[in-house]
Amino acid sequence: MKKLTICSEYTPSGDQPTAIKQLLEGIESGLAHQTLLGVTGSGKTYTIANVIEKLNRPTMMLAPNKTLAAQLYGEMKEFFPDNAVEYFVSYYDYYQPEAYVPTTDTFIEKDASVNEHIEQMRLSATKALLERRDVIIIASVSAIYGLGDPDSYLKMMLHISRGDIINQRDILRRLAELQYTRNDVAFARATYRVRGDVIDIFPAESDRLALRVELFDEEIERISQFDPLTGQVERTLDRVTVYPKTHYATPKEKIIAAVDKIKIELKHRSQQLKDNNKLVEEQRLTQRTQFDIEMMTELGYCSGIENYSRYLSGREEGGAPPTLFDYLPDDGLLIIDESHVTVPQIGAMYKGDRSRKENLVEYGFRLPSALDNRPMKFEEFEAISPQTIYVSATPSKFELEKCGSDIAEQVVRPTGLLDPEIEVRPVETQVDDLLSEINKRLPLDERVLATTLTKRMAEDLTDYLYDHGIKARYLHSDVDTVERVEIIRDFRLGKFDVLVGINLLREGLDMPEVSLVAILDADKEGFLRSDRSLIQTIGRAARNLNGRAILYGDRITGSMRRAIDETERRRVKQHQYNLDNNITPQGVVRRITDVMGVGSYSDAKSLDKVAEANTNYHINQQAEEPLLTTSQIDTKIVELEKLMQGHAQNLEFEQAAAMRDKIAKLRIQQLST
């Protein structure tokens, strides 16, 4: 059995050895809750990695959002390259839940766009938990939402061993039950193809390798893993397990039992609605439910099958839904990163979901059992959680009350860096002042973070900076998951110099290149400008030797005062430690990696992303267009217009937009010649 083993050139230093020892002693003595209070840049992730290695238990790390989950995933994959580090976040790029608005009599159908890459990673995560112990799962709060029942999921697996006697048609029937589709032309994830006595299966949880099962008559003669692109066989296997396409795959007998219970509930609910003279609602509910029952009986699933999860998983009314936590072994370890944000999120999910579903039930769109398709309640989360370590630079009241004195403090950084210096400046000239500060840092190849209060302000500030020759982009909740990771990677690579955000430029973002954090409208009290938010945002500059923070405000609020005082307290302690140990502060150098496998760094031709509206720039000076004569410009514009029309006809709109931007640039050049 493989052990969790760190591969790193670093050794614990500063406050890290003390924190590691304290956390390990707490876990081994049976403490249910502990807190690691570590300042930004003090190496909290490395401390936790050491704790995980020493304990050697399956571990789940919860992050407050997808951006931080992706960063944690990248760091843990670096620390544990030989172990199973998996990623489990919501697989929706876009999600509109079904809802009913009684005031306008509007029903909104469920609409969603699933990211296949993330869906594959989710399936890979549960597979790793079921098959091995050297597992670290990096998850978002998506982990508390209902997932397929692990017992049903295990029963659905298809086990194939060399030498088994099995009919080819039986294998194909089982693959259909696992919701795999036959496709002899386009071989993709969760499909299979048949060529004579050879069955090729592309597992749903695999991102690269497919399976080949070769039969001789009715005996399985050979099982191999191969590259579906080249056809090259990687290795032969004695046995293999094929996992279902979805976590909601359910054995036929369970579906039949569930359908019987759904019919009983439908009959009871229909009578209730009739008795209350709600005939429209009764007719609507009967029609929708009967359709779902037919689909489940014939195909084994239906659209919105999760709304019948109470019956499919055999739970009692009001029982906690099966979640990712049910796949985690009993001796697992839970790490809640940036706990001051993550814990409140866990508590908030249930109530928002409940209010929407109550309308659907009341107006006949769903059976009352649909209320049990929900995220866990906070008390259910607490009951199922294994031993927990909360990680935060600014723990909230909840963590402090839960842990009491069981808090490991990590204030001194291994690099000797101090917290950033803080300066308060007036709001009136904040944008122009920020522009001048940015221009000071450009020659030094340093980056700048600016935080605003609204999305509109972030976009307007980005446009303003761009108009003044600054390469800037914005990052907020409208930017999709994978693109956020790409934006942060491009920022660190120097493809642009200023990143403008609202609430995403806070916890955990690890960008050592940032030397200035500018907080606009810092004197506007609220959750975006609370002392915790300010400390977290200021901390983004704590990994740079020249780190500074500018708070723009006409007055010093209570939150600003607390943030400034806490930062100063830490600076004094850090400075004293450096003096006592003769340490010279050193800037952090961190390799830039493509954690999600979504892009290439040297891709000078890569397309500008949507968040970069009306913007087109390249960092590579050699890649810039040479100056052309007027006739050359005319010829070039005609060529680009043809390309643009071609891309548009092929529905390649991003490429067409890139051509449009090049044409606009040439027209400007044309006017200036």
From Swiss-Prot:
Top-level taxon in the UniProt lineage: Bacteria
GO MF terms, alphabetically ordered: ATP binding; ATP hydrolysis activity; DNA binding; excinuclease ABC activity
Keywords attached to this entry: ATP-binding, Cytoplasm, DNA damage, DNA excision, DNA repair, Excision nuclease, Nucleotide-binding, SOS response
Protein name: UvrABC system protein B
Binding locations of ATP: 38-45
UVR domain ranges (all copies): 634-669
NCBIfam families: PRK05298.1 (NF003673), uvrb (TIGR00631)
Residue ranges constituting the Helicase ATP-binding domain according to the UniProt record: 25-413
Any single GO CC term annotated in Swiss-Prot or TrEMBL for this entry: excinuclease repair complex
